Amino acid sequence: MFLGEYQHSLDEKGRITIPAKFREEIGYKFVATKGLDNCIFLYPQDEWQLIEKKLRSLPFTRADVRSFVRFFFSGAAELDLDRQGRSVLPLNLREYAGIDRDVIIIGVGTRVEIWSTEKWTDYNENAQSSYEEIAENLVDLGI
């Protein structure tokens, strides 16, 4: 399970260092894609395969399904870790997430998210005031 928050910076080659605590679980080959809220999602291969299977099972005749599947898969790339735990983030994903140099890498259970530091700060400032409301709504889902 991916947990925690880490600050990192991209190097001049667009590489990011994956936190040591995440490396074993993410594996040496993993998938990066456009995430929700303008971040980048990273998935271990086995988790990606589960999501891929679920998305393929959705009815492609629905416009919302087609739109989401296009969004999710068109931005996806299979990435490799080098021996130092680094991986090149594709330019299209960096541009999508507004990442220039400084990033926040967070563990979110079954995936890792990479945020520009600025967007993560803004997200947290805006979300803090609504955490209680969100928690109340989650009760309706049985959590």
Curated annotation (Swiss-Prot):
Gene3D superfamilies: Transcriptional regulator MraZ domain
Residues annotated as domain SpoVT-AbrB: 5-47, 76-119
Family designation: Belongs to the MraZ family.
Organism listed in the record: Syntrophomonas wolfei subsp. wolfei (strain DSM 2245B / Goettingen)
Major site of localization recorded for this protein: cytoplasm
Residues of the signal peptide: none
GO biological process, one term: negative regulation of DNA-templated transcription initiation
Record's keyword annotation contains Transcription regulation: yes
Subunit structure comment from the entry: Forms oligomers.
Subcellular location: Cytoplasm, Nucleoid
One Pfam family hit: MraZ
Domain of life: Bacteria
Protein name (Swiss-Prot/TrEMBL): Transcriptional regulator MraZ
